[in-house]
């Protein structure tokens, strides 16, 4: 008989909505049903929360196939149809009345990975997996992550930030300053988006304005970042006060860089676990991942991403993802599996860590 009721919270208002559904479905398929009773809660694009049959219908969708074969508008309309099919399934934050023991929020991006849902759960005294408010907010902002990481002694890529208002006031002046400061090619990145949403690698001066416009569509702060010519290495970290790092993995992008399409649609990227590196370098990357995890005060779990620069061999921090993907092709669960913790064990460990945080 299950000993804990787990609220699996998925969906959300970010551009990674569909990826969250895929992650949640994978978790639902791997959770130990003898130990845990699953209570799915779906958060729609509009922020409305749904439980029961409505949440289960969304969870049952074949979202990978829909992403590959269906337009975004059609997917959104189908989700709306399900959401409003039965108003009795609206969820009104009655966690205690529903007997929720612990929450597993798997909402990627804004509202789910930036401290907002963590703060909500804290207010209702519901234990939850992953990082708390402070670490979630810091790691969601790429600039804040860089500041903290550099202070802790990690290497970061040279960058600058541009605010949307400044750009709107004088776009040409901003473009000119960036082109003077950075050697092509360089990256334009929204400060607080995941899954490579809104990112452009700028190769020619005439591409910059469009790249900025694209990034400002999803954020009010944008990073301009030097391109690091090197290998993309990722590490899964798990734990609270005594975190452990997985064997590092390597991403070999199918295109110019590891973008949303590469990650979730065409599958052209090659993934290598363990990364094709000498043992001493693998160990050093894992050590740097733990250093970054602690510097940003992470708990529960995070995926820490690096570049290893070809010219210098430097291990350069790219970003920290506090709610990594849990899809069938996501690096976090695959790296943990390669380190001896399979998907079901990983879910169990995350839930136990959540309860451990509350007790401590």
From Swiss-Prot:
Coiled coil: none annotated. Binds 2 magnesium or manganese ions per subunit. InterPro entries: ATP-grasp, ATP_grasp_subdomain_1, D-Ala_lig_Van_CS, D_ala_D_ala, Dala_Dala_lig_C, Dala_Dala_lig_N, PreATP-grasp_dom_sf. PROSITE patterns: ATP_GRASP, DALA_DALA_LIGASE_1, DALA_DALA_LIGASE_2. Mg(2+) 1 binds at residues 305, 319. One of its GO terms (molecular function) is ATP binding. Mg(2+) 2 binds at residues 319, 321. Its EC number is 6.3.2.4. GO terms for biological process: cell wall organization; peptidoglycan biosynthetic process; regulation of cell shape. It catalyses: 2 D-alanine + ATP = D-alanyl-D-alanine + ADP + phosphate + H(+). Residues 146-352 form the ATP-grasp domain. Pfam families: Dala_Dala_lig_C, Dala_Dala_lig_N. Belongs to the D-alanine--D-alanine ligase family. This is D-alanine--D-alanine ligase. It comes from Prosthecochloris aestuarii (strain DSM 271 / SK 413). The gene is ddl.
């Amino acid at each position: 008989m299950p000993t804990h009721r787990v609220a699996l919270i998925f969906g959300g208002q970010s551009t990674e909505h569909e990826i969250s559904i895929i992650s949640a479905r994978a978790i639902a398929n791997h959770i130990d049903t003898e130990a845990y009773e699953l209570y799915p809660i779906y958060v729609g694009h509009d922020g409305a929360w749904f439980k029961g049959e409505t949440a289960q219908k969304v969870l049952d969708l074949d979202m990978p196939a829909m992403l590959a074969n269906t337009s975004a508008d059609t997917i959104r309309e189908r989700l709306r149809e399900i959401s409003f099919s039965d108003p009795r399934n609206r969820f009104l934050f009655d966690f205690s009345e529903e007997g929720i023991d612990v929450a597993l929020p798997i909402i990627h991006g804004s509202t789910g990975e930036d401290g907002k849902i963590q703060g909500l759960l804290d207010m209702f005294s519901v234990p939850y997996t992953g990082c708390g408010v402070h670490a979630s907010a810091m790691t969601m902002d790429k600039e804040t992550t860089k500041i903290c990481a550099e202070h802790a002694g990690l290497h970061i890529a040279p960058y600058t930030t541009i605010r949307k208002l400044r750009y709107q006031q004088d776009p040409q002046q901003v473009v000119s300053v960036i082109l003077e400061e950075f050697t092509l090619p360089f990256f334009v990145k929204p400060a607080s988006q995941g899954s490579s949403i809104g990112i452009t690698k700028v190769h020619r001066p005439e591409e910059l304005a469009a790249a900025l416009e694209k990034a400002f569509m999803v954020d009010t702060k944008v990073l301009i970042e030097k391109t690091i010519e090197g290998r993309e290495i990722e590490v899964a970290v798990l734990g609270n006060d005594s975190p452990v790092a997985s064997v590092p993995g390597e991403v070999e992008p199918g295109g110019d860089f590891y973008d949303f399409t590469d990650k979730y649609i065409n599958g052209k990227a090659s993934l290598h676990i363990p990364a094709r590196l000498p043992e001493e370098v693998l160990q050093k990357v894992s050590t740097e991942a733990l250093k970054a995890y602690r510097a940003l005060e992470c708990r529960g779990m995070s995926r820490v991403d690096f570049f290893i620069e070809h010219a210098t061999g430097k291990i350069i921090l790219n970003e920290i993802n506090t709610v990594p993907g849990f899809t069938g092709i996501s690096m976090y669960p695959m790296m943990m599996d390669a380190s001896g913790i399979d998907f079901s064990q990983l879910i169990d460990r995350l839930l136990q860590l959540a309860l451990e945080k509350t007790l401590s």
